[in-house]
Every structure is written in structure tokens, then in C-alpha cells.
Amino acid sequence: SNTTLRATGVTSSNCAMRAIAGLSLLLLAGCDKATEPGFAEAPEVSRHTVAYLKSLCDGRSSAAVTQDITIRGFITANDLYGEFDRTIVVEDPSGGIAIAAGHPLLADDYPFGAVATVRCNGLTLCNYGGKIELGSEPGDYGAEAIPREELSRYIRVTLPEEGERHRAAPLTFGEVSARHIDTRVRFDGVRFADAGKTWCDTDPETGRTVATERTIVDAGGNEFTVRSAATCAYATEPLP
């Protein structure tokens, strides 16, 4: 029988998805340089995995990070195409985490594919609907954003080392689990069941696009739900 799973992420831009054979999903001017807070190097012993960092918030609504904990991973999502407003996602082999960042143009300074080193001491982990996020403090809707003028104190962006590259993990629908939240995965040989529709529906009263769920189907007839943000730049474009 068909299996329906629900995705919590939003789709990546469909600009390069005219063929539906492969589909990628994701399961985030300062002050004067003389006064801008700088990124302090952390000892190697402070390096931990994303999974370890998130485990500090297990069973809790929030947890302040008071240890010297540093994570390092690829930036696999940002606000490019309107998908993750004021959010970047950092992913390492153990998992991914969304970081709330008070910057209106994150994609410029925190581009997809770059490497982010994040010093977490002084930040806060928040559990919002079962999803662990990192930010400045707890808020009503998850982690509050790290102020723009403080981002350079906590996050350093560098180019990948030679031969270092992020690759989306190829999965089947049945292999998706909680550990894949905020990670970039790939489904091969799938198609949209909603042919002819746009990525997002439009509210007939306001004329505005709304967050919309669409269904993809694999060769075995299994289904997976893909949710697209109302703010995405391709909301009114047809599904591939």
C-alpha cells in the first residue's frame, strides 16, 4: 500500500529542476570594522558535531549553551529565493541545524556551499515543534535571531578546503527519519502527483500566495509531501 510521509522542510529552487528525475529537498552593512565584534578562534577540543549540539536540548524547550562548543559544516540553506527568511542551515555528516540570523540578505554573506564555523557559547538552543534551532534567546516562535551586528562574533564563513564538497544524500521515502530534519537529501526517479499546478496556491480573497503542500510519487507508488513557503520566489511557477 502507498505510504504517505510528511516533510517539514521546503523545496529548493526549481530553477534547475525542469526534469523531475531527481529532486532536492531540505528536511537558515554592520557597524564600523574597528568596533565590530570578531570571531575568536576556539581550541580544537571544543569541536563537536551538530548532533551533539542538538542533543543538549533533548527533552527541553530551550537550553543556553554555556560551554565552548564549536560546530563546522556546509551552509545548505539561506534566504535565497525567499525560502528561509533570516535563517541559515548548517549541516555536517551528523545532521543539520537552523540558525536564526538578523540579516535581511543572508545569501550575500552566507552563501550556499560555503563552510560555516559556529561558536555556540552564549547562544541558545530552542525546541520549536520538535525541531531544534539555534539563536540568541528563546522566543514565542522558536529561537530569536542573532542580531546582525553580532553575527561575526559567532559565525565565520570560509571557502571549502580542496576536494571538500557537500553532496545531498540519496534516500528513499522510507529512509527519511528525524535525523534528516534540516539536512539536504535527494530523491531519484520521482514525479509530482499535482501536474499542472503551481508550487503554491493563491488565496482567492487576498490574491497572495500561501504555504502549500504538494505530493511527489516514486516508482513504487509511495508518496511524500513537500511543503513550499508562500514567500518563495517561484511560488507562482508551474511544477516541473
Where are each of the predicted segments found?
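Hydrophobic helical h-region of N-terminal Sec-dependent signal peptides
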Residues: 21-25
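C-terminal motif of bacterial Sec signal peptides marking the signal peptidase cleavage site
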Residues: 28-30
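Bacterial N-terminal signal peptides that target proteins for export
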Residues: 4-20
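OB-fold nucleic-acid-binding modules
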Residues: 32-240
